[in-house]
């Protein structure tokens, strides 16, 4: 039986486009499955591969100069990938190839190719901070929280780091400057821009086009190194993707957020790069200390945390005029846990217009209760807070994604109480609400504290879902 389509019954232009792309006459099945992809296929077919090769070579020279590969090898890898469809007969794989090639031909130049042209002048905007003056205070605060007991029998997952991280970091520094409306950074690198004594590994980023950027970067690395690069999506980390090499070594990761979320994230401008406001980052750190795993990290490397904490404390002292005199007033706010229903009630009336906050430890339960309230004014800040917030009838409803530490049976540990207070303050900052007095009291409540042992802790909310991935070598997309 003839598997080829009848030339007399098919639109000649569409058939010709598909035939040119595949390098062969398509089967009937291939034709009917691919004809809706004609526009993308056309873009791929007319794409100037020579210019693309030149851009990749320039990226290699600027950011990957120490990688031992020749210009001819790069060209061969690129041309091989753009002709891969001619040797592929599986429809699913053909769709994957078309999708990934389409991303490259429509976005690479604007996203990564632009990094090879002359950059705008860097606007120096650094302020001299006296971080040293905060080191002793930070050490005292962290010492009182260094209460985790490490279980030596616990098997920790290894986080293998690729040797390419330093190259990608160099690229990311330029990327953050060129794309500072759609990509901002946080974490150690952002604090390094304030305090050069901070050590950092990879660069932590939030952006509005994460998937496209990571696909383009994955191909750049593949074409330069020849390695198989895999993009993975983790179900319990919202809108998160990571690039790893074929040996499962971590290269870079990214959280994707909507543009409207990006617009409200507090940020500051340093050397043409936007970083998440260190005040906001400090609140996030205080919140994360409620997570038992983070306290275990603190016990393993307290000096790393001390450098970060001191930097952020100095920033808030300088920026907001915070006085560290130990006056904490009503901080941390009173917290009562309902362990059966997994809800913590925080008394907020001393600081805010809403009288209390109900912090749910199960996101699905919160979503259900919000529906029952028939309220449609909730704020979802995605991975920025990993939470939804709703204020209804003078009550805040929110999701708290970390563990709750207990200092005794039924008693919330002060570390978690401060974490919950910080979580509420994140909302205040994101919505331009009042937070400075509360921030001052919260930070002062961390001074001169004795260590309080952890009695127990709640479990984190279990997130459903499966891992997704893009395997470039095997032409597979699973999401």
From Swiss-Prot:
What keywords is this UniProt entry annotated with?
Answer: ATP-binding, Calcium, Early protein, Metal-binding, mRNA processing, Nucleotide-binding, Transcription, Transferase
Pfam families named among the record's database cross-references: Pox_polyA_pol, Pox_polyA_pol_C, Pox_polyA_pol_N
The stated induction of this gene product is:
Expressed in the early phase of the viral replicative cycle.
- Positions binding Ca(2+) 2 in this chain are 202, 204, 253
Family matches, as InterPro entries: PolyA_pol_cat_Poxvir, PolyA_pol_cat_sf, PolyA_pol_nucTrfase_Poxvir, PolyA_pol_nucTrfase_sf_Poxvir, Poxvirus_polyA_pol_cat_C, Poxvirus_polyA_pol_cat_N, Poxvirus_polyA_pol_cat_N_sf
This molecule's function is given as: Polymerase that creates the 3'-poly(A) tail of mRNA's.
Tell me how this protein assembles.
Answer: Heterodimer of a large (catalytic) subunit and a small (regulatory) subunit.
Q: What is this protein called?
A: Poly(A) polymerase catalytic subunit
Organism, scientific name = Camelpox virus (strain CMS)
Task: Provide the gene name from the record.
Answer: OPG063
């Amino acid at each position: 039986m003839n598997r080829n389509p009848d030339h007399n019954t098919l639109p000649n232009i569409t058939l010709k486009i598909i035939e040119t792309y595949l390098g062969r006459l398509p089967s009937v099945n291939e034709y009917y499955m691919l004809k809706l992809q004609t526009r993308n296929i056309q873009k791929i077919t007319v794409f100037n591969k020579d210019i693309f090769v030149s851009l990749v070579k320039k990226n290699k020279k600027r950011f990957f100069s120490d990688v031992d590969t020749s210009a001819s090898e790069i060209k061969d890898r690129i041309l091989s990938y753009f002709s891969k469809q001619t040797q592929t007969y599986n429809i699913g794989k053909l769709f994957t190839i078309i999708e990934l090639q389409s991303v490259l031909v429509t976005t690479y130049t604007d996203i990564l190719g632009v990094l090879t042209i002359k950059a705008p002048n860097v606007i120096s905007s650094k302020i001299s901070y006296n971080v040293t003056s905060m080191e002793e205070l930070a050490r005292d605060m962290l010492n009182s929280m260094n209460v985790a007991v490490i279980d030596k029998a616990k098997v920790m997952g290894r986080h293998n780091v690729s040797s390419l991280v330093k190259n990608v970091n160099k690229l990311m520094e330029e990327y953050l400057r060129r794309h500072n409306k759609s990509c901002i950074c946080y974490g150690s690198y952002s604090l390094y821009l304030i305090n050069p004594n901070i050590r950092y590994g990879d660069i932590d980023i939030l952006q509005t086009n994460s998937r496209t950027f990571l696909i383009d970067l994955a191909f750049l690395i593949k074409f330069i190194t020849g390695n198989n690069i895999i993009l993975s999506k983790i179900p319990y980390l919202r809108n998160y993707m990571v690039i790893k090499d074929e040996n499962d070594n971590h290269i870079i990761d990214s959280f994707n957020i909507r543009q409207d979320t990006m617009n409200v994230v507090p940020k500051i401008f340093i050397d043409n790069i936007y970083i998440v406001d260190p005040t906001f980052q400090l609140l996030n750190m205080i919140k994360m200390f409620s997570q038992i795993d983070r306290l275990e990290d603190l016990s393993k490397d307290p000096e790393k945390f001390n450098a970060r904490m001191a930097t952020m404390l100095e920033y808030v002292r300088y920026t907001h005029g915070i006085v560290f005199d130990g006056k904490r007033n009503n901080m941390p706010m009173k917290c009562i846990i309902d362990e059966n229903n997994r809800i913590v009630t925080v008394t907020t009336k001393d600081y805010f217009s809403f009288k209390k906050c109900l912090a749910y430890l199960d996101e699905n339960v919160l979503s259900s209760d919000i529906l029952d309230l028939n309220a449609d004014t909730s704020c979802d800040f995605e991975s920025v807070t990993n939470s939804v917030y709703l204020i209804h009838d003078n009550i805040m409803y929110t999701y708290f994604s970390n563990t709750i530490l207990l200092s005794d049976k039924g008693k919330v540990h002060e570390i978690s109480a401060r974490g919950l207070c910080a979580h509420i303050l994140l909302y205040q900052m994101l919505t331009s609400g009042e937070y400075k007095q509360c921030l001052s009291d919260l930070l002062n409540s961390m001074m001169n504290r004795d260590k309080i042992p952890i009695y127990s802790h709640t479990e984190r909310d279990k997130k459903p879902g499966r891992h997704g991935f893009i395997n470039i070598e095997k032409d597979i997309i699973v999401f």
